[in-house]
Amino acid sequence: MSVSELSTSTQNYLKVIWSLTEWSAEPVTATLISKQTGLRMSSVSDAVRKLAAQGLIVHAPYGSVELTEKGRGYAVDMIRRHRLIETFLVETLGYTWDEVHDEAEHLEHAVSDYLVDRLDKLLGHPTRDPHGDPIPTADGTVPALDACRLTDAGAGAGAAGTTVTVERISDSDPTLLKFFEENGIVVGAVLTVTEGAPFSESLDVKVDGAKNSVPPVSYTH
């Protein structure tokens, strides 16, 4: 069965579960899904039961939620759709990187597998989207990204003066993306850590001579 045959709700839940595991090592729970989606716990709990009944996740009562092999395959298909659409919107239609997430959220449920493959070919089989996120291949392989959180790169003694290259930035906050772009903090930018904040996840960095404070939404190497 193609991922296109799943309901929009099921597609969304699988994608959210995948995304949560991609950005954090924290176990995924119904509570975390509720927080991420803004949906009521009762709705999430019902959805989790249905996903488990379909063999798409494994869920222990009051425990973590894990994708099965089948569920992972569908989730990766949705991630592939989303990131290829974002790339198409930026590279072909001239969208800015802060505009594409919500557009892709709508379009990813409507496109066919055939159209997704055509987009992939048209774009030259890109491996990363405009935010630096890896784009899964047609066979479900997710390209590895050798990077760590900026706050990890700037942690510890002697962090000040560390130079890093931005590899990836979360697209969860369009306003923050716009701020980053206006200040030259984009994928591929070289940053110098000027000061770490031991009791905060933010870091002070310098890019092209200008200083900025950066929250923990970017990955670097």
What are these regions (language model features)?
Residues 4-39:
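N-terminal helix-turn-helix DNA-binding core of bacterial DNA-binding proteins
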Residues 54-60:
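A short, conserved structural fragment
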Residues 82-116:
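Ordered, amphipathic secondary-structure segments that act as subunit-interaction surfaces
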Residues 42:
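Key DNA-contact positions within bacterial/archaeal DNA-binding proteins
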Residues 220-221:
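Conserved small/polar residues in nucleotide/adenosyl-binding loops
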Residues 47-54:
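Basic amphipathic alpha-helical segments that dock to polyanions
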Residues 63-82:
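Basic, amphipathic "hinge/linker" alpha-helix immediately C-terminal to the N-terminal HTH DNA-binding motif
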Residues 108-214:
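Mid-protein regulatory/catalytic core that forms ligand/cofactor-binding pockets
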